[in-house]
Amino acid sequence: MGFPRILSKNNKIYTKLGEFCLSGDSFWIVCHTCQEELQTQDQFWKHIQDEHNFMHGVAKEHSRTSSYCLTDVEAAAAAATPGSSSQQGATAISVPLALYTCSTKYSEEEQREVEMHEQQVQHQVQQQQAQQQQAQQQQHQQSQQQGHQQHQVQQQQTHQQLQQQRDVAKELAELHANAVAAAAASAAVVSTGEGTTQSNSAIDIKIEPSSLTLTPEMQAAAAAGGTIYHLPQLVPPPVPPPPPGSGFVSVSASTSTSNTVSTTPPNVLQQQQQLNMSVVPSTAMAAAMLAASQEQLPKDSNSTTASAGSAVSSDDGERWYVCDYETCGLKFKYKSRMELHRVVHSKERRFNCELCSASFKQSCNLSTHRKKKHALRGIKSEILPQRF
C-alpha cells in the first residue's frame, strides 16, 4: 500500500510521514516527526521503522548510519513467526517499492503540469502588467491632452481679454478725439459769436460819463460820423443864465443818484441842428476827432472811471482797457465798455425811474423794471442819460 501524495509548486512531495525534496537528478526525504534528512527511500523507511516504530512488528533496532537492504528485511522476517511475521515482512518489502515507483512516476508528470501551470501564471501576470502599463500610458496621455486643452483655453481667454481691452481703448480714444473736436468747434463758434456781438454792439454800448460835455464842433463831427447815437438830454431844473463869453455852462445838481446834467444855450442847439443838416464828412476824420476829444476830456474823480494807465497794448498792436479795481483785471477793447463794467464795482445808481423811487446801475435793469412794474414800453432815449 502506498501513502497519499501532494505535489506542491516548490517541487516537493508531501506525505503523512515524509517530505520528498526533488533537486535536479537526486532527491532527499525529510521526516515530519524529527525533521531528519535521508538520502534514499530505503534509509527513510528504515528510519521510520526503527525510530518511530511505524511497522509495529519490527523489533530490531538499527542505527541511523546502518545500511538498510532487502536481505536484512528477509532475515528479520524468517526469524519471526510464520504467520504474522510473513505478512509484516511482505508489507515491509512491497510498500517501499510501490511507493518509490509511484512517487517517481507522479513526480515527473506532476512536475510538467506544475511547470505548465507556472508558465500560464507567469504569462497571465505579464499580460496583467502589460495591461496596467497601457492603462497608465493612456491616463498619462489623457492628462497631457487635458493640460494642453486647458492651456489653449487659457490662451484664448487671455487673447480675448486683450482684444476687449484694445477695443475699449480705441473707443475711449475716439470719444476723446470727438470731445476735443466738439470743444474746439464750440469754442470757435463762441469766439466768432463774441466777435460778431462786439462788432455789432460796439456802437450801442459806448457810454461816456454824463458829467463830460463836448464842444459843438466835436458833437457835430460825432453826429456826422454816425458811430455814436446822439440822444436828447434830460430837461434840468431852471438855472441862472450863463455869463457872457462862454460857449456853454455845465451845472451839477446834487440828487439822490448823483447825476450830472449839462445845459446848452439855444444858440448852441441851433448850431448843432445846422451842422446835422450839413454834408457828412468821412468816417475816418470823425473817428480821429472823437479820439482827440476823448484825450482832451478831464478825468472824472469817480472810482469807476478808467485811468490813463489802464490802457494796455497787446502783441498784435491792439489797445485794451484793463479794469484796475482791486483784483478784477478784466480787459475791454473799448473804454466805454470798461466803464460800463466798472459800475458793477461801485455803488452808483445812475438810472432812476421817473414813476417811482427805484434806481438801477444799468439801463437794461431800468427798462425791465418799467416793463414789469409800470407796463411801459418806451424808447431807450426816454430813460437813458446823456451818452456820446
From Swiss-Prot:
Residues 138-168, 240-265 are annotated as: Disordered. Residues 138-165, 249-265 have a biased composition (Low complexity). It is found in: Nucleus. A zinc finger (C2H2-type) spans 29-52, 321-345, 351-374. GO terms for molecular function: DNA-binding transcription factor activity, RNA polymerase II-specific; RNA polymerase II cis-regulatory region sequence-specific DNA binding; zinc ion binding. GO terms for biological process: positive regulation of transcription by RNA polymerase II; regulation of DNA-templated transcription; regulation of transcription by RNA polymerase II. InterPro entries: Zinc_finger (IPR050331), Znf_C2H2_sf (IPR036236), Znf_C2H2_type (IPR013087). Keywords: DNA-binding, Metal-binding, Nucleus, Repeat, Transcription, Transcription regulation, Zinc, Zinc-finger. Its main location: nucleus. One of its GO terms (cellular component) is nucleus. It comes from the Eukaryota. SMART domains: ZnF_C2H2. May be a transcription factor for genes having (A+T) stretches in their promoter and/or enhancer regions. Binds to AT rich DNA. This is AT-rich binding protein. It comes from Drosophila melanogaster. The lineage of its organism: Eukaryota, Metazoa, Ecdysozoa, Arthropoda, Hexapoda. The gene is ATbp.
